[in-house]
């Protein structure tokens, strides 16, 4: 399925309740685009004292960052973290390294324009060639989602490395991701199932299109990350690929876990 994509692709899926999963090209670095906004939000909540009050500046910026994926909000939150976008990016990188995300880099701000049991093989099968800038992998982004899910229960690597990120903070961020306004990607097919909820954060630029998130179903929850790159431009075929990966994973986990 992924090997048939006309471009470079990678994916990682794992049941967080059963532990089984699969991966392809999961350690290949892709231009990160907006996927790292999830890491920005996580870092802000780890530093902020308590959940931002509704309507406060930080609450408003976080909502703009996650729900419509606003670049100006991302830059404002990086400045909030440490006085500038570059210094704020350093803080985000520090958080990612603290939980073992070694193949992701937050490189400055965004250009604002108007308009669990059995190890899953993680390797580089086909890495895209691109210039300097933000990058991440399907493996790293799914690890961040897994860490947030664990943190929502008060456990896991984020709680250990960032005690300021409370279970309530993590649940607040997950709630925001449940309200993302975006063209269907991971939720292309599984989103039609009324017993399924998808919490996700996508990212896209002209040459790259990704989606990563959590899929909750009546029998459990799984994490999924699908990344695509094509030097001459990506299209909605990337969204359909993400949708097929999520649908296949859900079908498999339902069969295995009941």
Question: What do the predicted segments below correspond to?
Answer:
Residues 1-9, 14-18, 78-258:
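Penicillin-recognizing serine hydrolase domain
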Residues 26-31, 66, 130-135:
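A glycine-rich, coil/turn loop motif that links secondary-structure elements
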Residues 19, 29-53, 65, 224:
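Active-site SXXK
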Residues 45-72, 86, 98:
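Active-site-proximal loop and beta-strand segments within enzyme catalytic domains
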Residues 38-42, 71-72, 90:
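A generic alpha-helix surface/boundary motif
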Residues 18-28, 58, 122-126:
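Glycine/charged-rich beta-loop-alpha catalytic/anionic-binding loops adjacent to active sites
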């Amino acid at each position: 399925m992924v090997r048939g994509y006309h471009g470079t692709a990678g994916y990682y899926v794992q049941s967080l309740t059963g532990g089984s999963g699969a991966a392809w090209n999961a350690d290949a670095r892709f231009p990160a685009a907006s996927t790292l906004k999830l890491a920005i939000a996580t870092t802000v909540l780890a530093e902020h004292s308590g959940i931002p009050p509704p309507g406060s500046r930080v609450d408003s910026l976080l909502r703009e960052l996650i729900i419509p994926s606003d670049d100006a909000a991302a830059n404002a939150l990086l400045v909030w973290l440490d006085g500038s976008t570059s210094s704020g990016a350093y803080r985000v990188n520090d958080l990612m390294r603290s939980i073992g995300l070694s193949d992701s880099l937050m490189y400055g701000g965004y250009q604002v324009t108007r308009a669990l049991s059995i190890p899953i093989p993680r390797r580089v099968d086909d890495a895209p060639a691109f210039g300097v800038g933000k990058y991440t992998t399907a493996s790293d982004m799914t690890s961040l989602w897994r860490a947030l899910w664990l943190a929502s229960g008060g456990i896991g690597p984020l709680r250990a490395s960032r005690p300021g990120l409370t279970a309530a903070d993590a649940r607040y961020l997950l709630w925001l991701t449940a309200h993302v306004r975006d063209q269907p990607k991971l939720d292309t097919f599984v989103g039609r199932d009324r017993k399924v909820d998808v919490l996700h954060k996508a990212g896209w630029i002209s040459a790259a299109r990704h989606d990563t998130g959590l899929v909750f179903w009546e029998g459990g929850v799984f994490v999924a990350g699908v990344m695509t790159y094509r030097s001459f431009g990506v299209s909605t075929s990337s969204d359909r690929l993400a949708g097929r990966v999520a649908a296949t994973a859900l079908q498999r986990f339902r069969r295995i876990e009941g």
